[in-house]
Structure formats: C-alpha cells, structure tokens
Amino acid sequence: MYELITEKTLPEYEAFVQSHPKGNFAQSYLWGKQKPMWQWDAIAVRGEDGKIKGSLAVMTRKVPGIGRTLMYGCRGPVCDLDDRETFSQLLDGAKALAKKYKSYVIKIDPDVPSGNTAFSSMLQSFGFKTKEGGKNFEAIQPRYVFRLNVEGKTEEELLANFHQKWRYNIRLAERKGVTVRICGKEMIPAFADLMLTTGVRDGFVTRKPEYFANMLDNLGEHARLYMAFDPVGTPIAGTLAIHYGDKVWYLYGASSNEHRNLMPNYLLQWRMIQWAVETNCRIYDFRGVSGDVSEDNPLYGLFRFKQGFGGDFTEFIGEMDLVLSPAIYFAVEHGTSVFKELRKKVYLIRNRGK
C-alpha cells in the first residue's frame, strides 16, 4: 500500500532519501523547490516495521496547447531494486497521480547501471519502454557519467590515482596563483557571464542568473558555488556542486576564454572532490559525458578531462517511459526534439560575439 508524502511526513521522507544508497538530490523536496513550474509529489511505501522502504518523487508539468501533462520521476525510484512488490506499489501511486493530473506519460531515468538487465526487464514487464536516443546529451539527464569512488580514501590516495598530467595541472594552477573560493550569491552574475561564454563556445543553451541564485537559496548548505580567480582577483572559472546523502555532484561548470593556461578547471574539480572527502561521501559524480568515445567526437575533450581524474565510466539504463496516451506521446516527443534544436540554434545566433 502506497501513501503520498505530506508536510507532516516530509522530514521522514527526506531522511530516507538522504540515507539510501540510491538517494539522489533530484528526488529531494529541495529540488522540487528549484522547479517551481512543476508540481512536486512524493510517494512512499512502508515495511512491516512502519518505516519507509521505498519512495518515488515525481514532478508534473502542463504541456502547452494539449491540456495534458508530463510526469517525470528524475533519478527515481529510491528502493531495493530487487523488490518488485515495492516498485509495483510506488507505480500504483504514480498512476493515480497521473490520472489526477491527466498525464500522457510517466517518465523515469533511474540511478541504475545499464548492466542491471534484471531491473530493466522488470520495468518492461510493467509496460515501460526504453526511450531511444543518441549517445550525447539528448536526454533530460545524462545517460553517461564518470563516478569516482571516494569512500574511505585519503586525498593522497585519490591524487595518486589521477593521471599524472592532471596532478601536474592542479599544482600548476596553485603555483600560478589561482585561488578557489566558496562564494555566495554576490558572485552569481560573474558565474552566469562565464556560463554564457562557455555555452556559446561549446554550443549549448545556458540558464539565467536567477536560476543559479535560486539554487543556492533552495538547496542551502547542500549547494556550493566555487569560483576560481586569477592572481589579480578576476573570476576566470566557476562550478556549482551539490552534496546530498553520500554523494557530491558536479552540476554546472564554466570558464573564461582567457587564462585557460592557468588550468583553473582542474583545481576546481579537486576542490569539489575534497568536499566529497570531507563530508565522508561514497561517490563524487562528474556527471555527463558523451557515450560516443571516439576521438573525432567534438565532445571527446570533455570525456578525456573527466576520465583523467580516475573515475569509472558509468552508463545508466536511460529514460524509461510508461506511455499512457500513445498519440499524444508521439506528437509531443517529436515536437519537443524539433523545438529543442531550433531553440539552440536561435540562442547561439543571438549570443554569438557576446
């Protein structure tokens, strides 16, 4: 039997998600606050002892013009992946919410490696189908990431596992006078400017400054803005990271077109990894890379940069969709892909030269 999380049971829910090995910041109520255009709900299932043993947070948003909604359980569920009965009850709760909100699909992208074919088969038995896509960044969340196991390791042990050139670049940045500070919202404008520069340089759409400022507000102590400064105090790179449960995630990164020879990005990564060590985390997650690791892929440089820190290349099972209205699903999914590509082209044209 499932239950919907209420204001009264929210602290218990948050404690469960934070402590579970499959816990993820995207399943937190705090992340729901970061997405005010979405309706946030959470479903829980309790064991015989009365404690929560499984949960699924879903966000629902209206699709303009069709009177239906998209339901999305980002990086859910949070439960024992072998517990079919618990997942079945969580899905019952999601279906009830989908009926209430007139959702045309229930979409999930679990924190589950692609090698777990048993879980994929279980999802398929419930009617989920794999969302086909490319190997780059076509999905909502990255399917391919690098993850570094930091559990029980010292900084010296982690450094020893880095590629020697990466260790050299970290020390070079320090020798050249690069400093990294944890900053507040006063540095958001500078970070957003660096994000815009990076987006135009690398060909992706970036967020507005308000989004990053709200992240620091909504996630509080769970979020950090790291800024790197050159020897005269000019901001030359920055990152946004999230610590939740036993993981730290590298969420956003940006850098100037100048002073790249000072290697600020290497030092920024090391500072975030140190945060994971300081907070006794199990995993430092570098987040997305391309699944196409051929050297002629324009995204290969990003892959190589993250690979050099000694993490494990991880492929998730990807987006899984439970289609509730096939005709609307086809129309929306096709239209969304076309719109995203058009928006990207317009954005890059408008910001070229800024």
PLM regions and their residue ranges:
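A conserved beta-strand-loop-helix scaffold within acyl/acetyltransferase catalytic domains
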Residues: 2-49, 53-67, 110-118, 126-261
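Short, high-confidence coil segments that cap the C-terminus of an alpha-helix
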Residues: 40, 100-103, 278-281
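Active-site/acyl-donor-binding loops of N-acyltransferases
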Residues: 59-60, 124-153, 282-354
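Flexible glycine-rich active-site/ligand-binding loops centered on an Asp-His dyad
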Residues: 73
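The substrate-binding groove and active-site-proximal loops of carbohydrate-active enzymes
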Residues: 76-82, 260, 264
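A gly/proline- and charged-residue-enriched helix-loop-helix capping module
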Residues: 78-130
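Aromatic (often tryptophan-rich) hydrophobic motifs at membrane interfaces
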Residues: 88-97, 213-217, 222-330
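A structural signal for short, well-ordered beta-strand segments and their strand-loop junctions
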Residues: 104-109, 181-183, 283-285
